[in-house]
Structures are given as C-alpha cells and as structure tokens.
C-alpha cells in the first residue's frame, strides 16, 4: 500500500534501426502510484514503437496510473507508434494517458538557425531538449550522466 513506481524511458532510433519498447506498471496496493514517462527521437529511416501498459488490479483503491509517450521524428521517412494501454479493474482510481508523435516545428529550426546555428547543431539542441525533459527526471546522477553520454555518442555517429 502506498508504493510508487516511476519509469523513465528514452529511445533514439537512427539509420534503419527498428526499436520496440514495452513498459508495464501494475498497481497492486491501495494508494499506489505507477507512472510511465517515455520520449523518443527518430532520425533517418528509423522506427520506434512505445507500448505502455498501466494496470490497476481489483482492490487497489485510490491507485494512480499515468502514462505519457512522446515521439519526435526528424525525417519524413521515420516511422513511429505510441500505444498507451490502461487496464482498470477497480472503480475508485485515477488513470490517464497522453501520446503524441510529431516533427520539429520548422519555425523553431528557423529561429535557431537565424541565431547562427547550422542545421545539425540546431537539431542536436532540439533533441537534447526533448530528451532532457525525461533525463532530468532521473533521480540518480550516475544514471542521468550515462543517458546523456549514450545519447551524445549516438548523435555523434550521424
């Protein structure tokens, strides 16, 4: 009772890479909290699918299950799906989900480039900001630093 689970997920798909990321949080106890936050970026011909399941079992009164899945596509050849699933077996609960898939606003890119940034640097800033919204939520500094390092390494291979 009163337990908390907060999943933070980032995905970065490039080239012809295909990624499917499945997350699941099950609320068993009263007043338990299960939150899933997922952000992904797709470059080139990459494919990224987020499948998130929030499950509140019978008897878990006052439980809270929330999901947010957001994907940013940086190519018209990129493919993505965000599939939030809520399985609710109790009445007195709170549950919700949000999902969005979109491209970088051309006006944002124009603004950054009008300030002297080349397209690659502007894209990198947009990607870091988008994924940073999840990375900054990770409570363990070493894990945050590793996520930043892995992201930078992947972006530098482009």
Task: Outline where the language-model segments fall.
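Conserved beta-strand/loop scaffold segments within soluble protein domains that form the structured core
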Residues: 1-110, 114-117, 138, 142-158
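Extended amphipathic alpha-helical segments enriched in small hydrophobics
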Residues: 111-116, 121-132
């Amino acid at each position: 009772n009163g337990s908390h689970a907060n999943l933070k997920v980032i995905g970065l798909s490039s080239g012809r890479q295909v990624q499917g990321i499945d997350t699941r949080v099950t609320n068993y106890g009263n007043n338990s909290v299960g939150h899933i936050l997922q952000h992904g970026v797709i470059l080139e011909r990459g494919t990224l699918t987020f499948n998130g399941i929030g499950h509140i079992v019978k008897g878990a009164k006052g439980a809270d299950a929330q999901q947010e899945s957001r994907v940013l596509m940086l190519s018209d050849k990129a493919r993505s799906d965000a599939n939030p699933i809520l399985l609710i077996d109790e009445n007195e609960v709170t549950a919700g989900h949000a999902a969005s898939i979109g491209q970088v606003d051309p006006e944002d890119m124009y603004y950054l480039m009008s300030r002297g940034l080349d397209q690659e640097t502007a894209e990198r800033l947009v990607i870091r900001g988008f994924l940073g919204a999840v990375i900054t939520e990770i409570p363990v500094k070493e894990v945050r630093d590793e996520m930043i390092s892995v992201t930078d390494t992947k972006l530098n291979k482009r």
